[in-house]
């Protein structure tokens, strides 16, 4: 690698690093704006313990943690939806929603749309309740582990190893 290539690579790394730092700095600034608006640094906020942090500590595996995180993200989206008309904190909420979109949904618009559809479903609607109960068996089947299918496939070929030896 010649000197010019080295300088260009170094500049690219510096630019990418500083833009990431800038994005994180903007994100933290917006969280601080929300904390100030809600007076979230007040000592009485800690009364009764944390809202989410203790629950997150109890879940260790990534797949399990994703379940809890989805509920927490759902809470924040509902919170931001309730405050959508508040112009004082709108920019902060938009910045944080964008960061949630990138981190939780991997920038997938379709995942975000599906998630938002789910959190908007009215639980008290009788028609929705009937549909949900109608779909319950399929949902439960989708939740069950697929390991039984793999075991069944393996047990169907008992002579597979013997043929290779002959």
From Swiss-Prot:
Gene3D superfamilies, A to Z: 1.20.1250.10
Annotated localization: Secreted
Basic residues: compositionally biased ranges: 148-166
Modified residues (Pyrrolidone carboxylic acid): 24
GO biological process, one term: positive regulation of inflammatory response
Glycan-carrying positions: 39, 106
Keyword terms: Antiviral defense, Cytokine, Glycoprotein, Growth regulation, Pyrrolidone carboxylic acid, Secreted, Signal
Listed GO CC annotations: extracellular space
A Pfam family: IFN-gamma
Gene Ontology MF terms in the entry: cytokine activity; type II interferon receptor binding
SUPFAM superfamilies, sorted: 4-helical cytokines
Tissue: Released primarily from activated T lymphocytes.
Record region (Disordered): 147-166
Signal peptide region: 1-23
Chief localization: secreted
Subunit field text: Homodimer. Interacts with IFNGR1 (via extracellular domain); this interaction promotes IFNGR1 dimerization.
Family the entry assigns: Belongs to the type II (or gamma) interferon family.
Job description of the protein: Type II interferon produced by immune cells such as T-cells and NK cells that plays crucial roles in antimicrobial, antiviral, and antitumor responses by activating effector immune cells and enhancing antigen presentation. Primarily signals through the JAK-STAT pathway after interaction with its receptor IFNGR1 to affect gene regulation. Upon IFNG binding, IFNGR1 intracellular domain opens out to allow association of downstream signaling components JAK2, JAK1 and STAT1, leading to STAT1 activation, nuclear translocation and transcription of IFNG-regulated genes.
Protein name as catalogued: Interferon gamma
Species for this entry: Equus asinus
